[in-house]
Regions:
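Collagenous Gly-X-Y triple-helix signature in extracellular proteins
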Residues: 1-171
């Protein structure tokens, strides 16, 4: 997947889709950039990725500050030395299929894995942004669909920002 990490100090709601030039990170795992966050809420603050917690994005604001999402959904910037959460974003292959679930928080999609014998489920790439996926085992295994990457895969993001202390900054 590609994540555009080009510096952007534009106001939330005015951010345009990053081009394929600038600082591009190509990897299967990363952080969302500000454009992807803004796309989840049409430039407002009440989209499906705003859950009242602070979390970092991949987008630099300046040479010393990075953009983050404030607990009220607004975009801010600060030194990356602060302890805001991170939301891992993973790009899954376009061939991944849904085994069961309806995409809600109470019944998230479960994806096909090594132990599944029925691989005829719905392609994940046909589902909608904001729907829930249970991916992996243990804690922190709930994700949201963010986007489909031009036929190469589906980008998902952790439903809740992760912190190494095990707690979240709420105010």
């Amino acid at each position: 997947a590609k994540w555009n990490a080009t510096l952007d100090a534009t106001s939330l709601g005015s951010i345009t889709r990053p081009s394929n030039s600038g600082t591009i990170v190509t990897d299967a795992v990363g952080l969302l950039n500000m454009y992807e966050y803004q796309s989840s809420n049409n430039g407002e603050t009440n989209g499906y990725l705003n859950n009242g917690l602070y979390w970092w994005t991949l987008t630099p604001y300046s040479t010393s500050d990075v953009r983050f999402v404030y607990n009220n959904g607004y975009a801010h910037h600060n030194s990356p030395s602060y302890t805001d959460g991170v939301r891992p974003s993973i790009n899954l292959k376009s061939s991944v299929r849904i085994v069961d679930g309806d995409g809600t928080i109470d019944d998230p999609y479960r994806l096909n894995g090594d132990n599944d014998t029925n691989l005829s489920g719905t392609l994940l790439s046909s589902r909608y942004s904001g729907e829930y996926i249970k991916f992996g085992s243990g804690e922190n295994n709930l994700y949201r669909i963010v986007s489909h990457e031009n036929g190469t895969g589906t980008k998902i993001v952790s439903a809740v920002p992760l912190k190494n202390s095990g707690s979240h900054i709420e105010s």
